[in-house]
Design a protein with these regions (language model features):
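Flexible hinge/capping segments at coil-to-helix
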Residues: 68-107
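Beta-alpha-beta core module
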Residues: 63-76, 137-188
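Short, surface-exposed acidic/glycine-rich loop or hinge patches that mediate macromolecular interfaces
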Residues: 10, 37, 110, 186-187
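A late-sequence structural motif
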Residues: 15, 89, 167-211
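Hydrophobic hinge/microswitch elements
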Residues: 38-42, 47-50, 57, 109-167
Length: 211
């Protein structure tokens, strides 16, 4: 079974992997083809049947003239990560400790960026933003070096800690990351698409959505 997936560049790589892994466990052999790009370009590819599914952090944009259906996979809060040295300086009294702390944030195309900045405003916190990144993996690499505190979906917090040698300095459910599968089908029939959507809702995001 050929499974062609477009991944919006703002979706964390680890999230994309966990969402797609169930498709590789199907009884029928699956050959997966992953393409990463801006959401608009991926939707254009899907419109001419070059992709079976697009993973995104937002539903189908209303201003794009492409036939597509958004299927919400789930949502979760965010966690803040820092090296042990940085966490020792800014890890106490969360979230007040983020005041003037060096912060790495997602680029302006990521939906969570706006939610995060609004939350800072509501908390009357002004971190010192030292970097903005469209690529979440690059943001984590900078964070691993101790340049600043960064965020990631809480659902992958343990994995981020292990992989990058960082600590969780705080977390909130007031800022959420949301993930969607966009397809041309309202009624899902492609076995890979069905596997991805079912596993996300029943396993990966089940606890987060029921918090």
């Amino acid at each position: 079974v050929l499974f062609r997936v477009g991944i919006a560049d703002v979706v964390p790589k680890s999230i994309a992997y966990h969402l797609l892994a169930p498709a590789m466990a199907l009884s029928a052999p699956v050959r997966i083809v992953c393409r990463e790009d801006k959401l608009e370009r991926l939707l254009a590819e899907m419109a001419i049947q070059r992709l079976d599914l697009v993973l995104a952090d937002s539903p189908m944009p209303s201003e794009i003239d492409v036939k597509g259906v958004s299927h919400k996979l789930g949502e979760c809060g965010i966690s803040f990560f820092a090296t042990p040295k940085l966490a020792a300086l800014h890890g106490q009294d969360f979230p007040r400790a983020l005041q003037h702390a060096p912060m790495l944030v997602p680029g302006e195309h990521a939906m969570v960026r706006g939610r995060l900045m609004r939350w800072f405003g509501e908390q009357q916190i002004q971190p010192r933003i030292v970097g903005e990144f469209d690529d979440s993996a690059l943001m984590k690499a900078f964070g691993q070096s101790g340049i600043g505190i960064f965020i990631a979906p809480t659902v992958i917090a343990d994995e981020v800690r292990r992989q990058f040698g960082v600590e969780v300095s705080g977390r909130t459910d007031d800022v959420t990351e949301r993930f969607y599968a966009i397809s041309v089908e309202r009624r899902l029939t492609h076995p890979g698409v069905v596997a991805v959507t079912d596993a996300a809702r029943q396993e990966m995001f089940a606890k987060a959505d029921n918090r």
